[in-house]
Amino acid sequence: MQRNILFLQGPITPFFKLIADNLSAQGCACFRINLCFGDWLFWRGRESTEFRGSQQQWPAFIEQYLDQHQITDILLLGEQRFYHRHAIRLANARGIQVVTTDFGYLRPDWITFERNGMSANSDFPREPEKIIAMAEGLPEPNLQQRFKDSFVRQVFWDMQYHLLSTVLHVLYPGYRSHQLHHPIWVYLGTGLRLLKLR
């Protein structure tokens, strides 16, 4: 069966695009819906669709998109965002597998992928004895660092994503971020905190 995978908002990095390239090489069809200019920065062109409508238009849009593209799987970061909640509800009604990612329960160096959600929605057991039983017979994890990250690069990507999404909001007039505070205030507050640490 052909896997048609829809990528919604993910980490503010090229990570989702790299996953899609790998899955495409294995024969999957990968799609993306960009909700803001920051999304477009990390994935444009091939099989990407720009949603420029309002939040009120999103449920009907995503419902039609899932059916039109015969989506079999959805990959997204954080299931509590407005756009993601509606996509998940419609996916569950259609038997579409939803995989949620976040920055990992074990930090640094790990990223977590879970079916059906994370945290309170996680299917991962909470009892230590069940976790230990699941781990029996598994090899020791390879803790060798395979990828090197850069704080400066992460800051650059984050600022580029949020500031350009703010400045170029006119290109995606209906977009509403899940962030509680405007990025300018977040960056100013973070900068002041870092200065105080010196």
Per-region residue spans from a language model:
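Active-site-proximal region of nucleotide-activated glycan assembly enzymes
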Residues: 97-197
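N-terminal subdomain of nucleotide-sugar transferases
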Residues: 1-36
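Short, flexible coil/linker elements and helix-boundary hinge sites characteristic
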Residues: 27, 70-73, 172
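Active-site and donor-binding regions of nucleotide-sugar-utilizing enzymes
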Residues: 15, 35-131
